[in-house]
Amino acid sequence: MKYILFFAYTIFLLFVKFPVFSAPDRSKSTKLSEEQLLKKKEILLQVLKFGTTKERAMALRELEEFPSEHSGALIEQLGKILDRDPDWMMRVYAIRTVSELKLTQYEESILKLLKNEQPDIQRESIYATKKLKLEKATPILFEILKAQDFTKNSNLIVGLLDTLGGFPPQETISSFLLARLNENFNDPEIRAQIALFFGKNKDKKAESALLEIYKDSKEPITLRSFSVSSLGKMKSISSMQVIQEELEKIRNLKSKNEIKALQPLKIHSITALVSMGDKDILEELYAYARDDDPVVRLRAIKHLTDTGDMSVLEILEYKAQRDPSEKVKKAAKAAIEN
């Protein structure tokens, strides 16, 4: 009984005497003395071992801000949670902490968890693989990808494509995905994500397929838009004339409904041309950034960023400081910082 009371008192201290659990939006941590840090470490370690799921999750959040020179035992306990905790939610939280702290020493644990049958654990492990840049995971990720049904939209497929796209191109993966891209019976959103995959890793193996999709008016607008976006990212200079011709067709439309429907394709086409060095068309992209509609301006910030053109920095700096929309300001600031 006295041990239970002691632990209850410890938790009480955790909430009251020591600033162990911080507010998520707190910008600065309270400066603690060496003695306080050691006490806080002791309490956090106890919570990670014996606390409720909620308390342990909060303790992991605290670990993300804990001084690394004092966190050895806490990191070790994190590894134990990662490898063998019976509570799958705690393993998910542990994976997130490993990602946040970029603890590459747990690479093998993450690779094993990629094969975990619990969907949330597997999904979080995929995100961790991307954040930690674990290229070694490529064969495992590809095996998981091959087993998926591409006729159905799936967050798992999207996550796999996003992660694999960050690694250098591999012939087997590119060939497999190019085949799925060309199968028009597959889910259009998944095909669009495959198009983005090729732009992300700049694999020109897909260049001609992306161009054909872009030109095909029967293909979904999102797929065509993402295809031309990827052509821009891979600097497909040979595609510029076709993109300019398609853009001219859009400009010559008379139907208001058609003009509205093709706006995403238009702005992606403009962005692609700017990415490939067409300075003359950059002013059209600026026009979107000056639109009265904050939603249009917000999209324009992303497209300005996607161009990779340093000349857009001036308008981004203006938007970050003076745009009427806080969302646009925030997006512009993030674009500058990244």
Say what each PLM segment does.
Residues D87-P169:
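A generic tandem-repeat structural signature
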Residues G51-T52, P86-D87, E117-Q118, D149-N153, ...:
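Short inter-helical turns and helix N-cap capping residues of alpha-solenoid HEAT/ARM repeat scaffolds
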Residues E64, S99, K130, D162-G165, ...:
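Structural signature of alpha-helical solenoid repeat scaffolds
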Residues F18-Q77, M89:
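N-terminal leader/linker segments that initiate helical-solenoid repeat arrays
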Residues M1-A23:
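Classical Sec-dependent N-terminal signal peptides that target proteins to the secretory pathway
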Residues A59, A94, S125, I157-L160, ...:
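Conserved hydrophobic register position within alpha-solenoid helical repeats
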Residues E34-V47, S68-L82, L103-K115, L134-Q148, ...:
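Amphipathic alpha-helical scaffolding segments comprising HEAT/armadillo-like alpha-solenoid repeats
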Residues R56, R91, Q122, N153-I157, ...:
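Residue-level detector of extended alpha-helical repeat arrays and alpha-solenoid scaffolds
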